[in-house]
UniProtKB/Swiss-Prot annotation:
Pfam families: UPF0270 (PF06794). Belongs to the UPF0270 family. Disulfide bonds: none annotated. It comes from Vibrio vulnificus (strain YJ016). It comes from the Bacteria. Gene3D superfamilies: YehU-like. This is UPF0270 protein VV3048. NCBIfam families: PRK04966.1.
Length: 70
């Protein structure tokens, strides 16, 4: 189920984005980006609708996914 990111508290959203970018295997291409830059990129993807926050009822987890993959 897609959860509107605007309905998540700023602190929880920040923690979710941070967890997402810190995961091993998250690919940002050939360029090196700082943690702050990666966080800003994910925030921008959420704001423009390229990424979505997804809640799994089965696993009771929250994740960020590219909209095209969801």
């Amino acid at each position: 189920m897609i959860v509107p990111w605007q309905q998540i508290s700023p602190e929880a959203l920040s923690n979710l984005i941070r967890e997402f970018v810190l995961r091993e295997g998250t690919d940002y291409g050939e360029s090196e980006y700082s943690l702050e830059e990666k966080i800003a990129q994910v925030q921008q993807q959420l704001e423009c609708g390229e990424a979505v926050v997804v809640f799994s009822e089965l696993h009771e987890t929250v994740d960020i996914q590219l909209k095209q993959k969801f």
